[in-house]
């Protein structure tokens, strides 16, 4: 029997935090951000997040406030790797995006220590 996939399902982004070079914790997408991460049973991930409210932003800033990518994923222990097939961020295309993750029931934390952290909650209905 194959081990259960701890990420399988749809997850709503509840917060997205980034550390600046001086160690200050910021919320670059505001609170709350908007977005989802979907991990399907065929091994594909779809991630999209951005600002929930963009009415005060210029069209350029709106485009820069959105992060989206997809591709096949693999799990090794508490490490998630997404091989990015396409993204609105050119540097991600063809890259391996590696994140540590932790599950606590329907709560999921993904991130890179000292760089950023996203907190998500499983969508159940």
Where are these regions (language model features)?
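Lipid interaction determinants
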Residues: 1-125
């Amino acid at each position: 029997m194959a081990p259960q996939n701890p990420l399988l399902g749809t997850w709503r982004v509840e917060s997205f935090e980034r550390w600046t070079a001086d160690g200050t914790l910021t919320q670059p997408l505001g609170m709350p951000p908007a977005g989802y991460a979907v991990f399907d049973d065929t091994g594909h991930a779809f991630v999209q997040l951005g600002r929930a409210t963009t009415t005060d932003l210029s069209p350029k800033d709106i485009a820069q406030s959105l992060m989206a990518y997809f591709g096949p994923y693999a799990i090794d222990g508490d490490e998630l790797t997404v091989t990015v097939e396409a993204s609105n961020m050119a540097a991600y295309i063809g890259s391996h995006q590696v994140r540590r993750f932790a599950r606590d029931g329907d709560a999921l934390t993904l991130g890179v220590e000292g760089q950023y952290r996203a907190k998500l909650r499983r969508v159940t209905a």
